Amino acid sequence: MSSGGLLLLLGLLTLWAELTPVSGKKRPDFCYLPADTGPCMANFPRFYYDSASKKCKKFTYGGCHGNANNFETREECRKKCFASAARRPT
């Protein structure tokens, strides 16, 4: 095989390795919990992972209790639930 062919193969394998882990990992169970404002009456803007739409969505958190599907930023939500997986844990 020529050096150009090897370089192309190496590039394709690198691309495949970068894309494969996203679909091979499992989402944490808390990513499947519904948004939970909790019983308190504060108004904190937060984000939760909506497993039906597969998106991080904004909601208002009351400030206490709730659940672990509660993130201060959309980026944090994506890091924990969106980018880490493509299928629900079994």
From Swiss-Prot:
This protein's UniProt keywords: Disulfide bond, Protease inhibitor, Secreted, Serine protease inhibitor, Signal
Domain of life: Eukaryota
Tissue occurrence: Expressed by the venom gland.
UniProt xrefs under CDD domains: Kunitz_PPTI-like (cd22608)
Signal peptide stretch: 1-24
Disulfide bridge map: 31-81, 40-64, 56-77
Domain named BPTI/Kunitz inhibitor: residues: 31-81
Gene3D superfamilies assigned to the protein according to its UniProt record, in alphabetical order: Pancreatic trypsin inhibitor Kunitz domain
GO cellular component: extracellular space
InterPro entries in UniProt: Kunitz_BPTI, Kunitz_BPTI_sf, Prtase_inh_Kunz-CS, TFPI/VKTCI-like
Site (Reactive bond for chymotrypsin): 41-42
GO-annotated molecular function: serine-type endopeptidase inhibitor activity
A Pfam family this chain is assigned to: Kunitz_BPTI
Family that this chain belongs to: Belongs to the venom Kunitz-type family.
Official protein name in the record: Kunitz-type serine protease inhibitor bitisilin-2
Organism: Bitis gabonica (Gaboon adder)
